[in-house]
Amino acid sequence: MRYKITIEYNGSSFSGWQKQQHSANSIQETIENAIFNFSGERVSLHCGGRTDTGVHALGQVAHFNMERQFELYRIRNGINYHLKAIPIVVLSAEAVDDAFHARFSAKKRYYEYRIINRYAPAALEIGYVWQVFNPLDVNIMREAARHLLGKHNLSSFRSKDCQATNPVRTIDDIDIVQNGSHIYIKISAISFLHNQVRIIVGTLVEFGKNRTNPQEMLNILSQCKRNAAGITAPPHGLYLVKIDY
């Protein structure tokens, strides 16, 4: 039987989603152990979006197969019981067709990056936002972001460790919302390159901080080199919001 679970987690204390050979601190392995403790079965968990160290999730999706059948509320509650005191929670569980795959069946992924833009230090949101002290021109950031919409070679916006053979991606939407000192950068696409969202955010922040001409984003795109773009924004401001299927 194949099950789909939707998961929320605080990524601060984990080594990222993916199970590591020399680390027992991945989100994947933590949940797999909770499933074993609940059901007595060893499973392999497959996620819809592999998050890096320190990245959070509001709506991560994963699937796994089990021999035994359980009522869905028992799966959710049973896993959560064995995750108590750990900042991971299963929000829901569903039975799905064997053809469903959390990664390959996804139609769109939604990320949100959270910034607090003020000089006074953040007290309540440490570890959940990126604090940028210099004033940001959000209108310039919006204009620069418009040039990233659509299908592009995004080599300038992927890490040197990115293993994707094709750097072309299509960004469906970039929305930048300002609410007082908080800035939310929301990006959606069917798939992303490694560190793509964080490099885009770091680049947009440099545009907003330096009042760079938004047209310069076209030059960054055309160079197709990582050093043409801005810094990689820190992981703790990034959230995987949801995945559409």
Curated annotation (Swiss-Prot):
* Keyword tRNA processing listed: yes
Q: Is the keyword Membrane in the record?
A: no
The UniProt keywords, alphabetically, are: Isomerase, tRNA processing
Q: Which residues bind substrate?
A: 111
Which HAMAP family does this UniProt record tie to the protein? Answer: TruA
* Protein role: Formation of pseudouridine at positions 38, 39 and 40 in the anticodon stem and loop of transfer RNAs.
Task: Spell out the protein name for this chain.
Answer: tRNA pseudouridine synthase A
Per the UniProt entry, what species is this protein from, by scientific name? Wolbachia pipientis subsp. Culex pipiens (strain wPip)
